[in-house]
């Protein structure tokens, strides 16, 4: 049985962002066709930020944006084997290096290589090409990835928001401050954020639309509004968590320090919070908070929360496009007693 893993590759190197693909000083700034022959094409360029590129079997390479007349060579979409001649992948990772993985409870085990995928004159046979010069269809490919990427991001944000709430409550209890009004206020705001993000996730699935071939697509309005809400408010939720937890988020002893015969018992003594809270227990909470929000995984998440599936501006555009603004205008006119809009 073939268990083929496909990695979608969309974001180009882009070069000068103020110029379209066809007006770059370096034509390779966007993946494009450099030669055509009867049995296929040869492509050149690079795709950036491709999570897990080296772990899959196939690279589904698609345009990163809409193309126009004159940019036919950039309107290329194809399925390329990861080991095809000319494919080169540079990997980076936020995995901790040379550290005790007990101090990195998330990034020590859950980490992904980020691939910088280079197509150095790669031949693609005709039967692996989906789009070949049809500029009017380039944006369809680009948009299709954005929707699913944002749905995945929204799903992760919903679970992640609940995790931040749980950590905030646990560390507040360990610190003996769970009853303080300002702590409860911050956690309440985190709870509201988590609830709204999950509500958007559930709404986009409940209002999914079924296409002509039977495939279900999440509702674009709720998907994009939810992704925007989760990303735009993430930093504030992390700030609340850090404020509740305290400076030990970045200064707590390593787990190995508790095993040191000279200082282990002292670390356990002074890292304790309430009398019934063990010092190592509290320290492990700090390590999880640090790893999630202020270190290896946390740094990666801070960026990907904003950039995955397109930045905040992209979500604002799509949300506005799918919101029924005309209906809202009619509701306002009716409320004002003005009847129908003059344009109708």
Language-model features: where?
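Structural beta-strand/beta-sheet cores of well-ordered domains, especially the beta-sheet scaffolds
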Residues: 4-6, 39, 57-59, 74-78, ...
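Loop-to-helix element that buttresses phosphate recognition and phosphoryl-transfer chemistry
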Residues: 185-210, 228-236, 240-242
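Glycine-rich beta->alpha junctions and the first turn(s) of the following alpha-helix
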Residues: 100-195
């Amino acid at each position: 049985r073939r268990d083929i893993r496909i990695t979608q590759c969309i974001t180009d190197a882009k070069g000068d962002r103020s110029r379209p693909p066809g007006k770059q000083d370096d034509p390779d700034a966007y993946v494009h066709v450099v030669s055509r022959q009867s049995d296929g094409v040869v492509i050149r360029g690079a795709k950036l930020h491709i999570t897990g590129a080296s772990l899959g079997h196939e690279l589904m390479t698609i345009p990163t944006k809409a193309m126009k007349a004159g940019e036919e060579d950039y309107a290329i979409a194809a399925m390329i084997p990861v080991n095809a001649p000319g494919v080169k992948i540079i990997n980076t990772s936020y995995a901790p290096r040379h550290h005790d993985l007990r101090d990195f409870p998330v990034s020590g085990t859950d980490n992904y290589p980020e691939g910088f995928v280079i197509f150095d004159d790669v031949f693609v046979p005709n039967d692996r090409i989906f789009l070949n010069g049809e500029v009017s269809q380039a944006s369809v490919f680009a948009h299709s990835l954005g929707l699913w990427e944002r749905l995945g991001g929204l799903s992760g944000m919903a679970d992640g928001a609940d995790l931040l709430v749980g950590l905030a409550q646990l560390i507040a209890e360990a610190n003996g401050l769970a009853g303080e009004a300002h702590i409860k206020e911050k956690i309440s705001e985190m709870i509201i954020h988590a609830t709204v993000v999950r509500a958007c996730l559930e709404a986009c699935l409940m209002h999914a639309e079924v296409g002509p071939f039977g495939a279900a697509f999440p509702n674009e309005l709720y998907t994009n509004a939810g992704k925007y809400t989760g990303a735009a408010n993430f930093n504030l939720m992390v700030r609340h968590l850090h404020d509740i937890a305290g400076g030990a988020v970045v200064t707590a002893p390593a787990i190995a320090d508790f095993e040191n015969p000279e200082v282990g018992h002292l670390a356990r003594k002074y890292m304790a919070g309430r009398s019934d809270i063990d010092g190592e227990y509290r320290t492990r909470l700090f390590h999880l908070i640090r790893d999630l929000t202020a270190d290896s995984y946390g740094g990666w998440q801070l960026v990907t929360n904003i950039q995955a599936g397109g930045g905040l501006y992209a979500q604002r555009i799509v949300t506005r496009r799918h919101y029924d603004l005309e209906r809202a205008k009619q509701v306002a006119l009716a409320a004002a007693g003005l009847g129908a809009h003059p344009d109708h």
